[in-house]
Amino acid sequence: MKHLFLAVIAVLAMVSCGNVKEKDIETENATGVVLVQNQSYYEVVLSNGESIFFSGFDEKEGINGIAMDEDSVKASVSYGTGFFISNDGQIATNAHVVSNVVKDKDVNKSVAKVLEALKRLMAMAYNEYDEKYNEAQQAYNIANTDPDVSYDTFYRIRDYRDAIKEERDKYAQYYYGIDEIRASESEIKYHNKVSIAYNNTFVTNTDDFVSCVVTKTDTDHDLAIIQLKDKLTPVGKHVFEVSASDPLEDYSFTDKLTAKLSDDKNSKVFMTSFNLGPTLALTKEGVKSQFNSGSISQRTDDRLMYSIPSLPGSSGSPVVNHAGQLVAINYAGLNNTQSFNYGIRVKYLKNLMDK
């Protein structure tokens, strides 16, 4: 009887070691996630050797934040979530969070749209200056025939008219010069700066973010690895284990026993993220992540669908099971709902790490 009692105690102990308490998962994972910030802009190197710059491009809206020189372009700022996967400062996230995901086949189409949009802007600018020039010409004609106008006033009016004409003619040259540019021979370059903010720290501006470099990307599976420049994961930060085997398929004896006597380790999944980036994350106590749970509703070879609510900003979040094992990297929500989301299965992150 004593041996039977001890055996039961041993089994219960094994089961208790299987699944992890939700609060413990939340506490541990919160120390390993980071808020990822991406400041980016585009450069179009035209076939004539000149460059134009813009903040972003959308097929429906066209270009926005256009500038003729690099110093005046306003960078677009976006946010996502990342998590530590090594002790040397490596962080996993989505490729679309930290890199340009425009495919080469779309570049020429985008350049053509940029040029068309630029022509419209040049035409608008020309018309604006042409109107000013006509007004200045009228003032010049009056000053030229009015004996009461002093020479100083006349010369100021003339110089103003000439300056307006020079600006107007410059935009005319730009407009007709664009017609000679071949979109197929132009190139889009993506410039960006990636940085992170640690969970549970104070962030008041972009200078409080820590710089990183993008080291690896897998655009086919929307995965990326970034790394702290000093290659040192801070002490006390949880490092997520990226298993060589898939936790959704690999069950230890303890996992099987726990599933029979309690809950399957994959019956519930948890996500730690920064929904809406700093909009929700910034609190009086500093940057705070959100913790949500749900269940897996569908599996494919490369993706999971689960009922975890999320908002933009959660891209790149770690998704773990009830045993605390990393099973997926969150990357997209279904249209018109925040209640069902997709994640990339962890095996593809492992493949990227091993490259």
Predicted regions and their residues:
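Positively charged n-region of N-terminal signal peptides that target proteins for export
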Residues: M1-L4, G82
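Hydrophobic h-region of N-terminal signal peptides that target proteins for export
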Residues: I9-C17
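N-terminal activation segment of mature serine protease catalytic domains
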Residues: C17-A95, I181, E185-N199, T206-T215, ...
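Conserved active-site neighborhood of the chymotrypsin/trypsin-like protease fold
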Residues: N19, G89-K103, A136, A143, ...
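Flexible, gly/ser-rich surface segments that form the specificity/activation loops bordering the active-site cleft
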Residues: N19-E22, V45, V77, V203-D207, ...
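C-terminal cap/linker of serine protease catalytic domains
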Residues: V20, S99-I181, V327-K355
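Terminal peptide-recognition signature
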Residues: V36, G82, G89, T93, ...
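Short, solvent-exposed secondary-structure boundary/capping segments
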Residues: D222-Q227, R303-P309
